[in-house]
């Protein structure tokens, strides 16, 4: 896709990209390179991944990161119950074959006779699912900054060349024509390692300007120019506030959609639950909405 095609197709999904976003997506696709997207909460990092999956017609796998994730949740796992059932099934035959062997020889014989680590017992987790030859996918690694450094290290091989080395099984490498689209998001909760950053191209999504918010509302809702301008003014004010839960672009779109249905002064003032997700923010958000109510309410 060209830069203009990326811009137009993202807009068709309702995602309004800046030039920075379009060029970052173009570079990611041209080089088959993971894209690390940073920005404040609510600026549209996750929405970009969803919109791009829709544009490209790819299934999206989402890996929500948090401290404590292990490789059997991120990369792969084994079906231990099936392994035990396999052992039980061949046990009578094995007992007969190893009855005259020493312990070391018996272990070697069992290990060579029963495939405990074959494809039949391997459970692919999100990362492995994107390179196992089952079709091209988009992988969203969401909030990578909340994962531990050990989890970061776990992903290096995958992000480098879309392959995973699995002990006792071998190396799984992605077919050339199925290389995944990989987007990592970060809220800068902690500094990512240099090794992680070197494996990715980079995009920082800025907070949206008033004009950009108005454009989003025009594409995503049917509110008129006056209401869109008033809502955009509110959003710009929200972005400058130190809220416990910053208001996201998707939340402001939901609020505008509500106002389409009930734009009365009372309706606007009683719909703040669409914006406020922490009771400590209610007073500040409510005061801001009151300042712009004459531009928003019908």
Predicted regions located by residue number:
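C-terminal regulatory/interaction module of P-loop NTP-utilizing enzymes
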Residues: 1-298
């Amino acid at each position: 896709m060209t830069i203009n095609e990326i811009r137009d197709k993202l807009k068709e999904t309702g995602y309004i990209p800046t030039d920075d976003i379009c060029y970052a997506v173009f570079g990611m696709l041209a080089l088959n390179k993971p894209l690390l997207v940073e920005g404040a909460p609510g600026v549209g990092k996750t929405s970009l991944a969803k919109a791009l999956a829709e544009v490209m017609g790819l299934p999206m796998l989402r890996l929500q990161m948090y401290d404590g994730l292990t490789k059997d949740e991120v990369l792969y796992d084994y079906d231990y119950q099936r392994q035990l059932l396999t052992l039980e099934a061949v046990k009578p035959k094995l007992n007969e074959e190893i009855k005259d062997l020493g312990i070391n020889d018996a272990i070697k014989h069992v290990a060579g006779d029963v495939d405990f680590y074959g494809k039949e017992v391997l459970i692919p987790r999100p990362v492995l699912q994107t390179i196992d030859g089952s079709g091209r996918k988009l992988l969203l690694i969401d909030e990578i900054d909340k994962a531990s450094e050990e989890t970061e290290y776990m992903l290096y091989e995958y992000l480098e060349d879309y392959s995973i080395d699995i002990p006792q099984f071998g190396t799984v490498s992605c077919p050339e024509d199925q290389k995944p689209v990989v987007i990592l998001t970060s809220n800068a909760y902690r500094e990512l390692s240099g090794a992680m950053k070197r494996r990715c191209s980079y995009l920082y999504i800025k907070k949206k300007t008033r004009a950009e918010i108005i454009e989003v509302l025009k594409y995503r809702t049917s509110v008129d120019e006056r209401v869109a301008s008033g809502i955009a003014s509110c959003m710009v004010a929200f972005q400058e506030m130190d809220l416990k839960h910053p208001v996201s672009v998707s939340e402001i779109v939901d609020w505008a959609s509500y106002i389409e249905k009930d734009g009365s002064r009372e309706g606007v003032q009683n719909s703040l639950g669409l914006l406020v997700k922490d009771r400590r923010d209610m007073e500040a958000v409510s005061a801001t909405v009151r300042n712009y109510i004459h531009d928003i309410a019908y």
